């Protein structure tokens, strides 16, 4: 058993194992899992959060990519009837397969920083079956998720996540809470998918396209960055000033631009 616990964090998996008991308890309090709920933990590592999540009485599925950690997790939790272990890549996982009709999934993870953004976008595709998500992320990423218009952090990640979810930056975590310590600060974020988006786009894919095009050259004005998609007249028809830069627009303005694009021939 001691050999199993000597697993070294792997750089290629972006592993930094959480060990600070105070931080672990604070995360568990924020999640507040309850009996009968369906939980999914992405990247359980050595099980720092897993034990507390199971202690809530919830049913817990975990996804772990590192096959060398599987024996440790089976040894610690394999006899628990409410525990299911999946060895694989969360970026390719069908999260909807874990829930029955009408059920909602609560997602938890100390996400590897090198895949956090693509994984969040993958999870947003399954937003209808997700109740909420609690993630440990690089602090800089959480600040981008929770950003407001007008600042340098406001961009594609902020807009697309805030289109789908309410974002709450809960608290920060220093490097000393991990082994090995990362070179950056971390933070806990809560993402709660909306039942209905506050600013519904006719086609969310077109919204993503508009946002991506706008921020490809974020220092230029909209009349220039959106030229491949929308004319100046189209931008003005969406009640947006074409002389503004993309970081000056709020989510509602981007949705109006996407809905204007949806009206053009070829997008209806």
Swiss-Prot record:
The entry's keywords: Cytoplasm, Methyltransferase, RNA-binding, rRNA processing, S-adenosyl-L-methionine, Transferase
Reactions the enzyme catalyzes: adenosine(1518)/adenosine(1519) in 16S rRNA + 4 S-adenosyl-L-methionine = N(6)-dimethyladenosine(1518)/N(6)-dimethyladenosine(1519) in 16S rRNA + 4 S-adenosyl-L-homocysteine + 4 H(+)
Presence of keyword Methyltransferase: yes
Pfam families: RrnaAD
EC number: 2.1.1.182
Enzyme class: transferase
Compartment list: Cytoplasm
GO molecular function, one term: RNA binding
Organism domain of life: Bacteria
InterPro entries according to UniProt: KsgA/Erm, rRNA_Ade_diMease-like_C, rRNA_Ade_Mease_Trfase_CS, rRNA_Ade_methylase_Trfase_N, rRNA_adenine_dimethylase, SAM-dependent_MTases_sf
GO biological process: rRNA methylation
Example of a GO cellular component annotation carried by this entry: cytosol
Positions with a binding annotation for S-adenosyl-L-methionine: 16, 18, 43, 64, 89, 110
Physiological role: Specifically dimethylates two adjacent adenosines (A1518 and A1519) in the loop of a conserved hairpin near the 3'-end of 16S rRNA in the 30S particle. May play a critical role in biogenesis of 30S subunits.
Entry similarity comment: Belongs to the class I-like SAM-binding methyltransferase superfamily. rRNA adenine N(6)-methyltransferase family. RsmA subfamily.
Name listed for the protein in its UniProt record: Ribosomal RNA small subunit methyltransferase A
Gene designation per UniProt: rsmA
């Amino acid at each position: 058993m001691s050999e199993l616990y000597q697993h070294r964090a792997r750089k290629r998996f972006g592993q930094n194992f959480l060990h600070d008991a105070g931080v672990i308890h604070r995360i568990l309090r924020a999640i507040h899992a309850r009996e009968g709920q369906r939980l999914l933990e992405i990247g359980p590592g050595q099980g720092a959060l897993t034990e507390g999540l199971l202690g809530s009485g919830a049913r817990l599925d975990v996804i772990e990519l590192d096959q060398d950690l599987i024996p440790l997790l089976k040894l610690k939790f394999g006899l628990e009837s409410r525990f299911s272990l999946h060895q694989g890549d969360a970026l390719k996982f069908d999260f909807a397969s874990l829930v029955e009709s009408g059920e909602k999934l609560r997602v938890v993870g100390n996400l590897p920083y090198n895949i956090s953004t693509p994984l969040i976008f993958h999870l947003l595709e399954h937003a209808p079956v997700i109740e909420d998500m609690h993630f440990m992320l690089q602090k800089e990423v959480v600040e981008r998720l929770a950003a407001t218009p007008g600042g340098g952090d406001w961009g594609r990640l902020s807009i697309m996540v805030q289109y789908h979810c309410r974002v709450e930056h809960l608290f920060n975590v220093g490097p000393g809470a991990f082994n090995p310590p990362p070179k950056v600060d971390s933070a806990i974020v809560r993402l709660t998918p909306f039942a209905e988006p506050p600013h519904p786009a006719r086609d969310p894919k077109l919204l993503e396209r508009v946002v991506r095009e706008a921020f490809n050259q974020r220092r230029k004005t909209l009349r220039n960055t959106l030229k491949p998609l929308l004319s100046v007249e189209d931008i003005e028809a969406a009640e947006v000033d074409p002389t503004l830069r993309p970081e000056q627009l709020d989510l509602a303005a981007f949705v109006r631009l996407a809905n204007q694009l949806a009206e053009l021939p070829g997008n209806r």
